[in-house]
């Protein structure tokens, strides 16, 4: 999954920091921060890796009950059966989490058709989360998390959306939660030196997309051999009566590791229909 690929890159950086910490007499704290899509990646990374001591998530945290309206990569199969954003936040607890309710750009997918781009992409909308939804999910997160958990919500006047991300209050909370106590002059209005200024990321973005494409192409090239070794060789021809028993471990792996499993049908059939279209010659029903 594309979210997993991005998370793995963050965790690789955490590996590097942890390796550097092992060389030092006093380990430096490890924190992650992200805005908008980066907030999603920081959020999931912190839930997975306990070495991350403090996390700042800006412009992402909210209720996910309508995740199907968002871009398709966010609509992870079976996610909402167990995990809304509050549940993910509880996985970070008791480590520190700073949630910044900031404004995000509105994006509507798919992009317009143009030369080289077809109209085949799935629809989806990204927009600034509503304040009511953010407050409600924050309240759920606090109830689900361990007693004394440090989950700070940064908003404008305690109830409105911030116009910018990475505000002084959010960054200071992140530093304090990471046990880095900033001095009175920790912030500056000066621009970073030329060496620290990021160049437009278009070329870097293209390289990362190319990495993902090549990685998946490589998996496709070798998948036949992997399937033979890990699957078919473990299912040699046998008596038909033993086939179901032979397949059971692979069936469970498919359910648990690949596509998920629908719950068993334990309710009576309840078909329903509704009229969706009518002409002078026929009526169409949805069943």
Regions found by a protein language model. Give the residues of each.
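Gly/Ala-rich beta-loop-alpha elbow adjacent to hydrolase catalytic centers
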Residues: 31-42
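Active-site-proximal betaalpha loop/short-helix elements
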Residues: 38, 52-56
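A short acidic (Asp/Glu
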Residues: 42-43, 110
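Active-site signature of alpha/beta-hydrolase-fold catalytic machinery across serine-
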Residues: 44-48
